[in-house]
Regions:
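Gly/Ser-rich catalytic/binding loops embedded in alpha/beta enzyme cores
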Residues: 1-156
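Structural motif
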Residues: 52, 167-169
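Short loop segments at secondary-structure junctions
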Residues: 146, 175-176
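Structural signature of FAD isoalloxazine-binding scaffolds in flavoprotein oxidoreductases
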Residues: 161-166
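A short core secondary-structure module
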Residues: 176-190
C-alpha cells in the first residue's frame, strides 16, 4: 500500500503543478496511513476491496486534519462541519486519502471554473486549456490523469457526471439518501 501511495504522490508532484487537480495534499499523513494499512495486511487483517486504495476527496467534504475551503476565499469550515460519516466509512474500509481536490466556489457551477482558487486543467489537451467540467472538477481531473484511483465528488445538477464526461472517465450519481451528507457543504439536499 505504501509503495502504491508513494507512486501516486510522485505522480501528483509532477503533474499537479500543471493540472491543478488538488488544492491540498498531505503526503506525510497519507504515507503514514498507508504504512498502517501495510501493517494490517501483514497481520492478516482484511478490511475489504477498498483496503489500501489511494483516493481523493472533493474540497467540500471535511477531512480531519485537512482544510476545507469549499472553493472559496470566504472562511467556511464552520458551514461544512466536522468530518462526516462518508469519509469516516472510507477510512474504516482502509482507503488512503491523498488530499482534497479543487471545486468551483461552493460547488455551484458546471464548467469547473474557479477564479478564487484556480481551475483544474482538462488533462486531455496539453495545448489548449479546456474546461474540466464542474463542480467536481478536481476529482474528475485527478482520476483522468491517474492522480488517484478514484475520487469522491458531489452531484446536484451534474457535478460528478459533467466532469466525468469532459475528462473521459466514469462518474456515478447515487440515489438520494444512499450516502450520508454530514460533513459535506450543503448546496442542496440531493
Amino acid at each position: 500500500c505504501k509503495e502504491v501511495t508513494l507512486t501516486y504522490y510522485e505522480r501528483i508532484r509532477i503533474l499537479n503543478p500543471h493540472l491543478h487537480a488538488y488544492i491540498f495534499i498531505d503526503e506525510e499523513k497519507g504515507l503514514n496511513w498507508a504504512d498502517g494499512i501495510d501493517k494490517l495486511f501483514k497481520c492478516g487483517v482484511d478490511l475489504g476491496p477498498l483496503m489500501g486504495v489511494p483516493i481523493a476527496i472533493k474540497d467540500i467534504c471535511s477531512v480531519d486534519g485537512m482544510p476545507t475551503t469549499n472553493g472559496s476565499n470566504i472562511i467556511s469550515d464552520d458551514i461544512t462541519g466536522p468530518e462526516g460519516s462518508l469519509v469516516k466509512r472510507l477510512k474504516a474500509l482502509g482507503c488512503v486519502i491523498l488530499g482534497k481536490t479543487h471545486t468551483v466556489e461552493f460547488a455551484l457551477g458546471a464548467t469547473g471554473l474557479n477564479k478564487y482558487k484556480g481551475t483544474p486543467k482538462n488533462p486531455w489537451d496539453e495545448k489548449i486549456h479546456r474546461i474540466p467540467g464542474g463542480s467536481s472538477s478536481g476529482s474528475g481531473v485527478a482520476v483522468a490523469a491517474g492522480l488517484a484511483a478514484f475520487a469522491i465528488g458531489t452531484d446536484t445538477g451534474g457535478s460528478v457526471r459533467i466532469p466525468a464526461s469532459f475528462n473521459g472517465i466514469v462518474g456515478l450519481k447515487t440515489t438520494k439518501n444512499k450516502w450520508p451528507t454530514d460533513g459535506i457543504f450543503p448546496l442542496s439536499p440531493t
